[in-house]
Amino acid sequence: MKAPPFAYRRVDSVAAAAALLREHGDEARLIAGGQTLLATLGMRLSEPSLLIDIRGIAEMQGIAVADGHLRIGALARHVDVERSALVARHLPLLSLAAPHIAHAAIRNRGTFGGSIAFADPAAEWPACTVAADGALTLSDGTRSRTVAAADFFLGLYQTALRPDELITAVQFPLPGPQRRFAFTELARRHGDYATVGLALAGDVTDGRLDDPRIVYFGVGGTPVRARAAEAALAAGRAEPAALDRAVAELGGELAPAGDLYAAAATKLHLAGVLLRRGIQSLMAEDAQS
């Protein structure tokens, strides 16, 4: 594989990157970790005339807690999130999901914001961001705006990002002491894209589940929040009958497409299997705390 010819510019500010995006339009691509872009260049699936290297933008770096939120800079690598003590303490859902992202070599280079911006429907971070009520800070270098993760993913590889905007950070509200998380996915091999995956959150107190978030990935063009299944489980003890009702609701909420490895009916069945596993993990975490 050989990439097509391209010009290269390295920038150190969001404003500079946005200005180049406005100047060059569809002919420009941002590059940070490059774990998706480099592959598409090599296969000639993408032939931009300009690559804009944004790795040196300081305001897009780092992981911090302030003002009741966990802030993850868009340029934080997957491995940074995986190893972060702040993430493990305040938002363990991300710590649970990180080891499932591809392989170590990719996690060492790929970026948190890059994965979210690419919006692969089988990727882990988009679903986790929705399940944890994340909000994205988008900037064109002059103005910034905040978009809830639930409103950011519009369709297959489509997002609310404007052509001259960058994701600079993702903010997560710090969860309360009763918030519990679970993450599970099924893949043919570790590191492969998930056939079906689930990010799960809920308040658990004395065996009672409140305010659940059930977000699937790999079953649609975007992360899919299973609201009817949530309603079947909310304000209950997640007993077998309630869990059966929640699994039954998935048939009306998920419309997975079959592929070479699993038929649509198989994926729907697996979604129910993951929900049972995830709820069991969620409730077990409360029993151990």
Residue ranges and their predicted role:
Residues 1-289:
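C-terminal structural segment of proteins
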